[in-house]
Amino acid sequence: GPNLNLLEHRNKDVYGIVSFDDYYLKLKQQYAIQIDYYQSNIEGELIDKIQEVGFTYDYIILNAGGYTHTSIAIADCLELISCPVIEVHISNIYSRETVRQKSLLSKHCMGCIVGLGLNSYKLAIDHIISG
């Protein structure tokens, strides 16, 4: 999702000091499954990627960042695909500004993990593996 490419420059108390690229490399080493990562700041590119993999991947773990609260287009895309989606957020969106407390995407996701830092991704993978 948007701004993950600059994660280590955000509020350190919420987002930590590790870049997402570094975290992703460590995450891949922990599991004997294929884990692909795609990041874009452009809504249309995110939709294109979801459409590309949404009928062939086993799962999508999606952090749509700010688009979570604004993108009807991403919500519509999630409704169309057959792949189950787990929505994750590093911060607790429900403890943030009012505009950030509503997800347009959640109703199209099998579950949501919020506010547990980068560990949210690991928890999503653990759920997928437990199956």
What residue spans do the PLM features occupy?
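Short glycine-rich anion-binding loops that position phosphate/pyrophosphate groups of nucleotides
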Residues: 2-5, 65-68, 91-93
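Short acidic active-site motifs
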Residues: 45-49
